[in-house]
UniProtKB/Swiss-Prot annotation:
GO annotation terms (biological process): lipid A biosynthetic process
GO molecular function: acyltransferase activity
Gene Ontology CC terms, in alphabetical order: cell outer membrane
Name the record gives this protein: Lipid A acyltransferase PagP
Recorded catalytic activity of this chain's protein: a lipid A + a 1,2-diacyl-sn-glycero-3-phosphocholine = a hepta-acyl lipid A + a 2-acyl-sn-glycero-3-phosphocholine; a lipid IVA + a 1,2-diacyl-sn-glycero-3-phosphocholine = a lipid IVB + a 2-acyl-sn-glycero-3-phosphocholine; a lipid IIA + a 1,2-diacyl-sn-glycero-3-phosphocholine = a lipid IIB + a 2-acyl-sn-glycero-3-phosphocholine
UniProt subunit comment: Homodimer.
The keyword Metal-binding appears for this protein: no
Lineage: Bacteria, Pseudomonadati, Pseudomonadota, Gammaproteobacteria, Enterobacterales
Keyword Electron transport among UniProt keywords: no
Length: 191
């Protein structure tokens, strides 16, 4: 029963995170401050996203310079799971998404992560416009078994390389010795 309440708590936290998107009218992002721009982009993404995305975790890599061999041997570096999101490209060609993904973490326990993501997009090859690169951030909420599934906010960097609708996207979770310092990547397919 306790696990049930912890999962309900996570759901409530996610709903609170996106309350601005569900409740606000979309206004021009250029006329406001950073927080207003953020909430308006979340709202615009929630209300006007023409794309649906499938997320498939690809790799978890613990930085060998920050972990001892005992921890490396114990940890799972082959996550499996899936996720779903909605996304859009703005007038500048930048990518926005709202998503929820669940995967097996370092301890081989389920970890959900839901949030908003933004990436500045580049198409550096005139001849090959289908190839794109991105850099940005994700802001969301996660919960882990070793933290008793208490919802924890997270703000993480994002980077990607893609071809047409398929994108290899990744983040790096900073940390201390034997904690954090994890490269996590997934494939994202846009429908």
């Amino acid at each position: 029963m306790r696990l049930f309440y912890q999962r309900i708590s996570l759901l409530i936290s996610l709903c609170g995170f996106f309350s601005a998107a569900w409740a606000s009218d979309v206004q021009p992002a250029s006329s406001t401050g950073l927080w207003q721009r953020f909430t308006q982009n979340v709202a615009e993404t929630w209300h006007h996203s023409p794309h649906q995305d499938l997320y498939v975790p690809a790799i978890t890599w613990h930085n060998r310079f920050t972990y001892d061999d005992e921890h490396i041997r114990r940890y799972n570096e082959r996550p499996w799971g899936a996720g779903y999101g909605i996304s859009r490209y703005d007038e500048k060609g930048n990518w926005h998404a709202i998503y929820l993904i669940a995967f097996k973490d370092s301890f081989n326990k389920w970890e959900p992560f839901g949030g908003y993501a933004w990436e500045k997009q580049w198409r550096p090859f005139d001849r090959y416009q289908d190839i794109h690169f991105g850099a940005g951030f994700t802001a969301g909420v996660t919960a882990r078994d070793n933290w008793k599934y208490i919802p924890v906010p997270a703000l993480l960097p994002l980077a990607s390389v893609g071809y047409k609708q398929l994108t290899f996207q990744a983040t790096y979770i900073p940390g201390t010795y034997n904690n954090g310092n994890v490269f996590f990547a997934w494939l994202r397919y846009r429908f």
